[in-house]
């Protein structure tokens, strides 16, 4: 078997133009170009590593062969979900981090259920996890909020200090898979409590206990709030205490955390009928004086519709000092009240499809658009899409634009620069939010790469064209006179438009490049159809073919190749082109076979937006009657060359001849050559290929057929795979195949044999039934026969004289039967029917029930006795109504309704009664 050699597209300079990659849509993926090597780089760029749709296709062209495939066979799961981190700063009164996950409508239909995992990591590497489940087919699962509580131990002790947490998330199909970190986001954590509210729980002579909360603190469905117990003691020795708490049935205590290392907190729950939570607080021994928080309590309200009816009341009972049998004083029992409100908006979030935008509209003149959605996150961790109720504006329209309805952000080509912080504002009711986009802008001027900026005429290479003739005498004609002429053709030049997308920080002067380096450029040739122009079209023209651009010389002169921005009326780049009358000659013709082309796109590790492209060419014929294309290129005396498959087919002709036509056949048209393997016994046949001018201009060179412009000889290897595996390979393959599988049970041998025998019996039975169908007339003959026997033997009183005539016809009568004699025209049938004494007819009678059966054998098998012939009516095929009309003599007639008709069916003659009665019997025809 032929082993394919995988070749990177940048490894062979001579095939840089023969192997060409294009993408569709062309603005979603780009081939990277290395400016130092003038060859395609080995990687392809896809923004964010996510396509806009699954239909992103890549096509590789090699000679006249092409191979296409999807860039992404499966949509990456992280591309089907948009995740926004809602919480930017965590405060101790609301110790949790919220993340919003939204399904991407355009990509989620290609994936199933999605699980989003989120992870918080502290500075000490402690982690907290959260997850949510998404499914676009369920209305309630198109978006979700992940709320992860932050442990109180992660908050700094000093309220004037802040600590940092990292948030990361990943996407998978199942929620039980291992977590894999994506790029992490940093979040600040602060212990400061702004606008505190103080409620006194106990106020003794030497100790006071207070409850700290935020001002105007209120609860809503599924919300969480933090309450702090503050102790102030000025005694010589601080006494222990017990704090009892009765919570509302709508509330639950999530966490109790000691905030001071000088106190030991023991939490317990009392049994019925008390239902309170006891906090036994014990200070360190001989601790004198204290003024700080000792306990943080995280309380959560249930998500019930009845939760917002009344205020929340918490009952406190503080017992100071050691326990005694005396009841505690009543002045240490306090009830605190908190208001309950409906779930309200806590944050407004902008969820874009892409965080970064490539301003290619400046180059292509086609608007670049990215969708946008606006969500609200409530205090109770509920998400709602409010895009249609929002209004958006851009901070700078020269960088980025946004639709007023917040449906999308876009770039139309009128922008002047990019930015790493292009802000978009969204307004919903009284809430306002912003989002910062990163907009990459083309670095001007662009770059144009050309295989040759000077186009010369090619010696002896004639091409034809129609030339307009001048009209004399000032006579106006409806159609101008034209003349066919041949001239030397001009060279072609391949063109690539290259761009570098960057962001420059005006304040710091830092430069960021999207391709990771300023020398790695994007090949944007496929998107400049509308902006790539020639300043003088009489000198040269630009044509696009299969995603490539080429400049074609027309007349001697100078021109400029320009990429122009119509929005701003400015030239992004220009390159001079010179078309001169200086002749160059063809110096050689190179060719190579391409039997098959395939490629693969592989991701580059740690670079999610970059992919490596590898192309495989098969240059050998591996099967009989396989066809290979011949890629040919012609070189010139000025060290330039052109692939012939890029030229117009009317410019040239190619002829090819095989040295062994029994092994290798050549099939060529005017401009294409293909070879076909015929025999494998000659492994390396030779093909001679010659290049000539077009046939229309062949006679213009010295009045004779022109000589070949270039000739080359090509070896085409034939490697037919007729090898058989060795005995060792067979044994190993058999042992692998015969080994019983865990998933498929083995079948016993006797059951297999019985199954085969049953199938054979079934086949024989079906064959017998089909053959017995040919004797269907026998059933119609025998059934009335036995019925007559039973009826005649059972009734002796009734005497009947019955004659029943039954005609039997063969299913497929041979040509020698008498029925074939009546398959001709009418005159032949009448002539044969008149001969009523044909010796080839034989009568066999069964007199038991007076049934006469007439059988017409072939003439070759009947011995006729001429002396014992008796006149009888001719027996004909009952399938023909035309022939049956001649069975009964003309004198035998029967009358029906006063009209005379010929008797064309079998007839019965019944005796008895006193007369004869002719009846029309039932016609029986056996096919």
From Swiss-Prot:
Keyword S-adenosyl-L-methionine attached: no
Signal peptide: 1-18
Disrupted-gene phenotype: Mutants exhibit striking morphological defects in the dopaminergic PDE neurons.
Membrane association type: Single-pass type I membrane protein
Subcellular localization: Membrane
GO cellular component: membrane
Coiled-coil region(s): none
Stretch list, region Disordered: 789-842
Taxonomy, superkingdom: Eukaryota
Example GO BP: dopaminergic neuron differentiation
Cited function: Regulates neuronal morphology via inhibition of the WAVE regulatory complex (WCR), a complex that controls F-actin cytoskeletal dynamics.
Family: Belongs to the TMEM132 family.
Protein name from the UniProt record: Transmembrane protein 132 homolog
Natural source organism: Caenorhabditis elegans
């Amino acid at each position: 078997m032929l082993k394919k050699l995988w070749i990177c597209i940048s490894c062979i300079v001579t095939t840089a133009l023969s192997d060409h990659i294009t993408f569709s849509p062309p603005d979603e993926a780009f081939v990277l170009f290395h400016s130092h090597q003038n060859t395609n780089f080995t990687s392809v760029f896809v923004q964010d590593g996510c396509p806009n749709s699954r239909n992103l296709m890549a096509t590789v062209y090699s000679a006249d062969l092409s191979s296409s495939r999807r860039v992404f066979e499966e949509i990456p799961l992280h591309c089907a979900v948009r995740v926004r981190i809602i919480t930017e700063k965590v405060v101790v009164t609301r110790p949790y981090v919220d993340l919003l996950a939204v399904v991407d409508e355009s990509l989620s239909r290609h994936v199933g259920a999605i699980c989003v995992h989120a992870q918080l990591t502290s500075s000490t590497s402690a982690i907290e996890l959260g997850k949510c489940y998404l499914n676009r087919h369920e209305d309630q699962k198109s978006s979700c909020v992940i709320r992860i509580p932050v442990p109180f131990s992660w908050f700094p002790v000093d309220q004037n200090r802040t600590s940092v947490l990292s948030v990361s998330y990943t996407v998978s199909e199942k929620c039980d898979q291992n977590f894999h970190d994506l790029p992490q986001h940093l979040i600040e954590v602060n212990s400061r409590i702004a606008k505190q509210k103080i409620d006194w729980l106990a106020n003794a002579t030497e100790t006071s206990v207070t409850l700290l909360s935020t001002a105007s603190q209120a609860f809503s469905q599924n919300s969480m709030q933090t309450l702090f117990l503050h102790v102030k003691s000025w005694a010589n020795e601080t006494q222990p205490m017990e704090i009892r708490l009765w919570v509302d049935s709508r509330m639950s205590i999530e966490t109790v955390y000691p905030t001071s290392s000088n106190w030991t907190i023991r939490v317990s729950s009392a049994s019925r009928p008390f239902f309170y939570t006891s906090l036994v607080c014990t200070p360190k021994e001989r601790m004198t004086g204290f003024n700080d928080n000792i306990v943080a309590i995280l309380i959560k309200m249930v998500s019930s519709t009845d939760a917002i009816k009344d205020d929340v009341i918490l009952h406190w009972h503080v017992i100071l000092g050691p326990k005694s049998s005396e009841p505690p004083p009543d002045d240490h029992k306090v009830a605190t009240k908190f208001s309950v409100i409906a779930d309200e908006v806590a944050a407004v979030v902008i969820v874009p499809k892409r965080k970064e935008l490539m301003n290619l509209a400046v180059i292509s003149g086609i608007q670049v658009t990215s969708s946008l959605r606006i969500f609200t996150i409530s205090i109770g961790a509920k998400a709602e899409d409010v895009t249609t109720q929002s209004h958006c504006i851009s901070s700078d329209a020269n960088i980025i634009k946004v639709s007023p309805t917040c449906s999308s952000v876009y770039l139309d080509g009128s922008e002047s620069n990019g930015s790493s912080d292009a802000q978009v504002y969204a307004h919903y009711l009284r809430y306002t939010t912003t989002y910062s986009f990163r907009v990459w802008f083309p670095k001007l001027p662009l770059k144009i790469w050309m295989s040759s900026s000077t186009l010369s005429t090619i010696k002896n290479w004639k091409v034809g064209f129609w030339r307009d003739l001048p009209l004399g005498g000032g006579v106006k004609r409806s159609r101008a006179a034209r003349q066919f002429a041949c001239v030397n053709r001009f060279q072609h030049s391949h063109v690539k438009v290259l761009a570098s997308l960057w962001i420059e920080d005006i304040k710091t002067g830092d430069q960021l490049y999207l391709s990771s380096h300023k020398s790695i450029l994007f090949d944007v040739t496929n998107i400049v159809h509308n902006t790539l122009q020639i300043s003088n079209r009489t000198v040269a023209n630009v044509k696009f073919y299969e995603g490539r651009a080429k400049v074609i010389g027309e007349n001697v002169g100078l021109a400029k190749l320009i990429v122009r921005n119509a929005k701003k009326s400015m030239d992004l780049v220009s390159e001079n082109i010179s078309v001169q009358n200086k002749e160059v000659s063809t110096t050689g013709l190179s060719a190579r076979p391409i039997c098959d082309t395939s490629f693969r796109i592989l991701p580059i590790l740690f670079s999610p937006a970059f992919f490596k492209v590898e192309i495989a060419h098969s240059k050998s014929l591996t099967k009989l009657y396989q066809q290979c294309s011949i890629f040919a290129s012609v070189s010139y005396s000025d060290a330039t060359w052109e692939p012939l498959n890029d030229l117009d087919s009317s410019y040239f002709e190619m002829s090819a001849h095989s040295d062994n036509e029994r092994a290798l056949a050549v099939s060529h048209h005017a401009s294409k050559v293909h070879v076909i393997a015929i025999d494998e016994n000659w492994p390396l046949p030779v093909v001679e290929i010659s290049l000539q001018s077009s046939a229309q201009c062949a006679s213009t060179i010295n009045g004779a057929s022109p000589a070949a412009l270039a000739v080359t000889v090509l070896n085409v290897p034939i490697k037919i795979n007729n090898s058989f595996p060795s005995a060792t390979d067979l044994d190993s393959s058999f042992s692998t195949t015969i080994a019983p599988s865990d998933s498929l049970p083995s079948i016993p041998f006797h059951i297999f044999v019985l199954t085969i025998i049953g199938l054979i019996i079934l086949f024989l039975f079906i064959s017998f039934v089909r053959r017995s169908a040919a004797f269907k007339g026998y059933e119609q003959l025998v059934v009335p026969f036995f019925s007559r026997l039973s009826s005649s033997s059972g009734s002796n009183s009734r005497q009947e004289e019955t004659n029943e005539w039954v005609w039997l016809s063969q299913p497929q009568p041979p040509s020698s039967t008498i029925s074939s004699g009546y398959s001709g025209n009418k005159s032949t049938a009448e002539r044969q029917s008149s001969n009523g004494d044909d010796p080839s007819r034989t009568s066999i009678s069964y007199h038991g029930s007076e049934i006469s059966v007439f059988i017409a054998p072939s003439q070759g098998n009947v011995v006729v006795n001429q002396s014992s012939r008796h006149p009888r009516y001719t027996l004909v095929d009952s399938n023909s109504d035309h022939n049956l009309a001649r069975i009964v003599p003309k004198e035998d007639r029967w009358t029906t309704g006063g009209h005379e008709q010929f008797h064309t069916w079998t007839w019965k003659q019944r005796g008895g009664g006193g007369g004869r009665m002719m009846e029309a019997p039932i016609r029986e025809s056996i096919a």
